[in-house]
Amino acid sequence: EIALWVSDKMPQLVKDLTRICRIPSVAVVPEDKKPPYGPECVRVLDEMLQIGKEYGLDTKNFDSCVGRIRYGDGEKSIGIWSHLDVVPVGGYWEHDPFEPVVEQGYMIARGCQDNKSSAVMALYVLLYMKEHKIKLPYSLDAYMGTSEEVGMFDIDYFVAHYQCPELSLVPDSGFPVCCGERGSFNGELTANDSVSERLISLSCDCGLYSVPNIAEAVVMDAPRIKELISSRKSSVTVEQMQTENGKRAWKLTAHGITAHGASPKAGSNALTILC
């Protein structure tokens, strides 16, 4: 019965998911770490709550930080948590990352899997309960945060100012069941040795918690550079260019395989290939 209901609702679910995936909700963290976390995160939260209202569900906006869509009126509650903020968009997308498309049964858009689809999934759990008039001894709440990708300051703020559910569930994509998360370090590394003057730039294209799949270096022309280029790896492409002052340079682009920072062995680091 549930499978048939989901199949029937799928076209509308895709429309709802498309509505929020069109919003470029990259979180912006103010110095005091307090909400809101940028105008686009405010907008996507308002849009998600509006969808909940359209289905006749109770909604609440907690200071443009966290949103809640509720089914039931029990004194105690179970929370289903997701987040609507996304990591910044890099290059090399085949589609506009904020104009969702469906190909071979998959929706392609920035933030679709991480984590807007979980928000819409939780909404449809509540909608199923409502349409089937299922009575629960507690409230079932879908919570949506807006700064998970940049430090989870939304949760810090919510816990400090509002009452939390008695039980919280976090259906974060395909990760295994767990009760915690790995630690992380965000910082800057500085080399003691000076960098060659022939190196104009070195960069990679990836999110904060991802193995980079693209890395680029621009170097001034030199005999040894030509020698290195001639013996380059097949995964490195080379393009001749000119600097602003008209001197010849080379742009080296390495292609790796992206992966989540929690499982780096699943990828191939483009920076490592380039170096």
PLM features per residue range, with description:
Residues 67, 106-107, 248-250:
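Hydrophobic residues embedded in beta-strands of well-ordered beta-sheets
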Residues 65-67, 74, 146-150, 257:
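Short, internal active-site loops enriched in acidic
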Residues 59, 100-102, 238-240:
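A structural signal for short hydrophobic beta-strand segments in well-ordered beta-sheet cores
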Residues 149, 155-157, 161-275:
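Midchain, well-structured core segments that form catalytic/ion-binding scaffolds
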Residues 60-63, 109, 142, 169-171, ...:
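General beta-strand structural signal in soluble alpha/beta enzymes
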